[in-house]
Swiss-Prot record:
Cofactor(s) listed in the protein's UniProt record: FMN
A GO cellular-component term linked to this record: membrane
EC supergroup of this enzyme: oxidoreductase
The protein's Enzyme Commission number: 1.6.5.2
Binding sites annotated in the UniProt record for NAD(+): Y11
Annotated protein name in UniProt: NAD(P)H dehydrogenase (quinone)
Occurrences of domain Flavodoxin-like (ranges): 3-194
Gene Ontology molecular functions: flavin adenine dinucleotide binding; FMN binding; NAD binding; NADH:ubiquinone reductase (non-electrogenic) activity; NADP binding; NADPH dehydrogenase (quinone) activity
Keywords for this protein: Flavoprotein, FMN, NAD, NADP, Nucleotide-binding, Oxidoreductase
Pfam families in the cross-refs: FMN_red
Catalytic activity of the protein: a quinone + NADH + H(+) = a quinol + NAD(+); a quinone + NADPH + H(+) = a quinol + NADP(+)
Length: 204
């Protein structure tokens, strides 16, 4: 059973979370985690002006996802930073290339799940995940979130990402904060949870 983790990251937070999601997937017997990134759509000049050039080198070795790989996966977990409370345009562009999967119903009945990051605590993590879910529903996917059985999302001991909609991390106003242990635990939990549900959905 193949669980595809397809992400966009500009500064590395979503990449780090994607690695943790993959760990969670791999903790399920028979589940293979495949990490892919979506194509970059901004020019090198714009990326340099945004201070992304060095950061993106950390995950340049991850292969770029193809639409066929998306269609062939047993479950898909999407990771995107928030952009004004929505998914990043790079992810949007990738989704807009999947029309033929919609036509053929390739994703119907497969588990789909979303995780995110933002600079500020209330900067749109929930709206990013929930508006992403609309796309999954149009593709006929079965939406999987991050249940409250992941107790780390209820903690009052620290400022943390994570909601019933999906794992998340807060990068901080300058983007210098890295995903906390609790946020990474949420990402691992989500990966494991999706893989467990996908295993049930794919059982004959
Ligand atoms: C154009 C743009 C819009 C953004 N919009 C938001 C926003 O609405 N709320 C917020 O908290 N952070 C916002 N951010 C910050 C990003 O979400 C943050 O850089 C990202 O989550 C870090 O993830 P990454 O390291 O994987 O790129 C924005 C960043 C950019 C470049």
């Amino acid at each position: 059973m193949k669980v595809l983790i397809v992400f966009y990251s500009m500064y590395g937070h979503i990449y780090r979370m994607a690695e943790a999601v993959a760990e969670g997937v791999r903790s399920v017997d028979g589940a293979e985690a495949v990490l892919r990134r979506v194509p970059e759509t901004l020019s090198a000049e714009i990326l340099a002006s945004m201070g992304a050039t060095e950061a993106q080198k950390q995950f340049a070795h991850i292969p770029v996802c193809t639409v066929d790989e998306l269609g062939a996966a047993d479950a898909v977990i999407f990771g995107t930073p928030t952009r004004f409370g929505n998914m990043a345009g790079q992810m949007r562009q990738f989704l807009d290339a999947t029309g033929r999967l919609w036509v053929s119903g390739a994703l119907v009945g497969k588990a789909g799940s979303v995780f995110t990051s933002s600079n500020t605590q209330h900067g749109g993590q929930e709206s990013t995940i929930l508006s992403f879910h609309i796309n999954l529903l149009h593709q006929g996917m079965v939406i999987v979130g991050l249940p409250y059985s992941f107790q780390g999302q209820s903690t009052m001991d620290e400022i943390t990402g994570g909601s019933p909609y999906g794992a998340s991390t807060i990068a901080g106003p300058t983007g210098a904060r890295t995903p906390s242990d609790n946020e990474l635990a949420g990402a691992r939990y989500q990966g494991r949870h999706v893989a467990e549900i996908a295993r049930k959905l794919t059982r004959n």
